[in-house]
Amino acid sequence: MEPRAATTGELVRAASPSFQARLWKNLQLGVGKGKGGGGGRAGGPEHRTAATPTPSPPPPGTTQDALAGVGSTGSRWSGFKKRKQVLDRVFSSSQPNLCCSSPEPLEPGGAGRAEQGSTLRRRLREHLLPVAKGSSTATGTGGVTPPGGRSPDSAPSSSSASSSLSSSPQPPPRGDRVRDESTRRGGPGVHLCHQKSSSLPGTACLEQLLEPAPPPAEPARGPAEPQALQKDIERDCSQKISTVGNSNADVPLADPGMYQLDITLRRGQSLAARDRGGTSDPYVKFKIGRKEVFRSKIIHKNLNPVWEEKACVLIDHLREPLYIKVFDYDFGLQDDFMGSAFLDLTQLELNRSTDVTLTLKDPHYPDHDLGIILLSVILTPKEGEHRDVTMLMRKSWKRSSKFQTQSLRLSDQHRKSHLWRGIVSITLIEGRDLKAMDSNGLSDPYVKFRLGHQKYKSKIMPKTLNPQWREQFDFHLYEERGGIMDITAWDKDAGKRDDFIGRCQVDLSSLSREQTHKLELHLEEGEGHLVLLVTLTASATVCISDLSVNSMEDQKEREEILKRYSPLRIFNNLKDVGFLQVKVIRAEGLMAADVTGKSDPFCVVELNNDRLLTHTVYKNLNPEWNKVFTFNIKDIHSVLEVTVYDEDRDRSADFLGRVAIPLLSIQNGEQKAYVLKNKQLTGPTKGVIYLEIDVIFNAVKASLRTLIPKERKYIEEENRLSKQLLLRNFIRTKRCVIVLVNAAYYVNSCFDWDSPPRSLAAFVLFLLIVWNFELYMIPLLLLLLLTWNYFLIISGKDNRQRDTVVEDMLEDEEEEDDRDDKDGEKKGFINKIYAIQEVCVSVQNILDEVASLGERIKNTFNWTVPFLSWLAIVALCVFTAILYFIPLRYIVLVWGINKFTKKLRSPYAIDNNELLDFLSRVPSDVQVVQYQELKPDHSHSPYKRKKNNLG
C-alpha cells in the first residue's frame, strides 16, 4: 500500500490535472463497476462502437494509475459519488445558458477572446481544458473519454444531464447528417465532439468555448480546495442562470435564433356544414402559441374551398406547433367552429417544400369527420440576423386590434432596408351588368380589393347594376413577381349580412411595368364585369435605417434629393411631390402599461397609407429607438402621425400616446420634444417623444396636387353612432348657419333703418357697387379680405381666437367614448338596431361635412395654413385678371366646352371639383385643435392617466 499511497499523494500535488477531470474519471470507474465489476478501463473497450477509436494505454505512473488507487478506496468512492451528482446538477443547470448567452454561434478561434470577462467560462477553461489537452498530448491518441463518449450501456446513468442540455441556439442535428460527419471525421478528439453533439446537443457550444484556451499550469491545491472550487462553480452557474433566464430543461430542440415559415394554404375537402342550407362560409386561422399570425379570406357557401393564400411567419423557436383552426363565418353572430389540427414544426425538413394533409378534429366530438386541410410549408432557418435590428411592420385591419405582422430586417452591411419593390396604381372605373341581389331587381354594389395584407373598400353605389365608381388608390408591391390581387363584389344590405355578387383575380406578375393596362374582368361565381386600370410603377423612397445611416447628413445624397425636387423639374413625375425624413430618437416618461410598472414600447410612424414601425424596447419607460424613416410625399398637406404602443404578446397592443404633425408646420433639422396626446388628440397623456424631421418638396408640384382629390386611407375606423358626436356636429353646423343668419339680420336692419347713419351708408354703397359692378370684382373682394387679415396678423392684431368651445366638446366626447368602450363589452352585437343607426350616422356625417366646409372657408381667410392662403391669393389674382380682360361670354363658352368634351378627351377621368379639393386641404376647427402642439409640463403630471386599448 505504500507505493499506492505515494501515487495518491502525487495526484493531489499534480499541476496539470484538475479536480473535475478526476470526477469524470471516477464516473467511468463507477459505471464500469455497476455493469460488470471489471473496472473503468477494463469495461470500457468492450462496449465501444466500431466508429469509436480505442485510446492508447497510458504510461505507468500517470494520472489513471492514481485514480485507480483512489477508486479502490470505499470511503473515498462515496465522496466521489456525491461530487458526481453535484457535477451533473451543475452542468444540467448551467450548460444551456452557456450556449444561449451569445446571440451568434461562437467561432472556435474567437470564443475565448469574445467571452474573456465571463467568470464562469474562465473557471471552466482553467479547470476542464488543461486535463483534456494535457491527457491528449500525453497519450497521443485520445486521452480521457467523458460521459458523452462512453458506451451505450452506460447512457442511462446520465439521463438527467442529457435531458437538461437539450436547449441550444444551434439547429437540431439530423440523424443522417450526423452519421455522414462521423464517417468523414477521424481521431479521438473529433469523436469526442461527435458524441457530445449527438447525445448531448448542448455540449457542442461548451467545446467551442473551451477549445482555443491554452493549457495554463495549475498551482498546487490543498485537500479542501476541490470543495471550494465546487461551490464556486455552483455559485457562478446560479449567477449565470439569473442573468440569462431560466432554461427549459424539457425542451429537446435547438434554435438558431429565428426561423421563417412559409405557408401556402391550398384548399379544404369535405368540410363540415354549419349553415341551414347545408353549406358553410369557411375561413382559416393560424396560431403559434396563443398568438394569431394569419387569417384567410372567407369562401362563401362552399364545403370544398380553394384558398391558395400564402403567409410568411417569423418564429423564434420550434417548440410551439402551428395550430390550424377552421371557422364558419356568421355575420352578426359568433362564428361556428369547424375543426382544428396541429402541425409539429420539428418534423419538417429544412429548406424543402412539404405538402401536408391535416385531418380536422373537434376535441369535444373526436369521432366526427370534419374534413381535411391541405397545406404546403417551407421551413428556413434565419441565421446570422440579430433581433435588435428587426423592424416590424404591422397592418391593422379595419376595426381590429390585432396585427398582421411582417418582419423587415436591416442589412448587416448597410443597416438600411427598402420596404417595398414597387407600387401598383389601381383605378376602379365601373361595373357592367352585375347580378341583381335585392327584391327590386337592383343592387347596392361595392368592391373589396386585397393584395397580401393590404385591403381597400370602394364606396357604395345605391340601386344600380351598372355602377360608376371612378376611384383611384395604390397598393405596395412587396414581392418581385407582384403577387395575386383578389377582387370581390358585394351588395350592401342594411341590418343583415351583405350579399356576395362575384369574385375575380389579377395576376400582377403577368403585367408589364410602367404601362397602364385596361382590364375587363368577368366575375366568377356570379354575373357581370368589372373595368379596371392597373399601372405598375417603380418603388418609392420609403425605407428604415439606423441613426448612423442618415441620407440628409450625407452631402452627396442630400444634393441628389435637392436636385430631384428642384423647381426646374416640375413635370417629372407629378405624383412625387417631396421627401420626408423622420428621426425617432427616444421617449421619456411613458405610461406604465404592465403590472410590473413598466412598458414594452414601440413606435408607429404613419404618413397617409405608409405605416412603419420601430423595434420594441422591453421593460422601459424611457426607450431609445434611434431609427430613421424616409417617406415619399404625395401630398404636402398630409399629416404625419407618430403613435406609441405597448407590445403585448398575448393580446392587442396598448395605446400609450400619439402626436399629429402637419408637414407644412415642420421646421427642418430641429429636434423637438412633442407631448403625447390621447387617442382622439384632444388632450395630453403621459410622456414626451423626441423627433427630428426634415421635409423637402417642390412647391409647384405641391400646388398642382392640391387641386386633385385627396388620397383616401385604406384603413379607417367605422363610423358609429355617438350621442355626443351627433350633438357636436349639430352645434358646429349651427354656428356656421348662425353666421349667415346674423348677416341676413344685419342687412334687414339696414332696410328697416334701425340705425339711420348705417342705413344711409349702406344705401350709398349699394348704388356705387351696382352701377360700377364688374364680374372681376368678386375675386378681387375676396383678395382684399385675405390681404386685410394678413396685415392684421403681421401687425400683431390677430383676431383669431382659440376655440375653447370645440375643445370642451372634444373632451366631453372622449369621456363618452370611454363609457362606450366599457358598455360595449356588455352589449351584444345582435341587440343593435341597424336601420336606425345607419340613418343617424348618415345625418351625423352630413352635419360634419357641412360644418367642416364652413370652418374651412373661414380658416382659409384666417391664414390658418399660410401656404394655402398664399395659393388662394395667386389663384384669385389670376381669376381677377381673367375676368377683367376677357368677356364673360368667352369664359362661359370655354367652361362649357371643357365640361362637354372632358369625357371624350379622357373617358376614364375621375370627376372632381377643384375648389372642393382645395378646401379639403384646409383643416377644420376640430383638426386645428388636434394638430396643436402641447408644451411639456415637467412639474405636473397629466390629469388623466389611463390605459387605452388600440381601437
From Swiss-Prot:
It is found in: Cytoplasmic vesicle, Secretory vesicle, Synaptic vesicle membrane; Recycling endosome; Endoplasmic reticulum membrane. Residues 174-184 have a biased composition (Basic and acidic residues). Ca(2+) 5 binds at residues 594, 600, 646, 648. It holds the Pfam family PRT_C. Keywords: Calcium, Cytoplasmic vesicle, Endoplasmic reticulum, Endosome, Membrane, Metal-binding, Repeat, Synapse, Transmembrane, Transmembrane helix. The keyword DNA damage does not apply. Residues 147-168, 219-228 have a biased composition (Low complexity). This is Multiple C2 and transmembrane domain-containing protein 1.
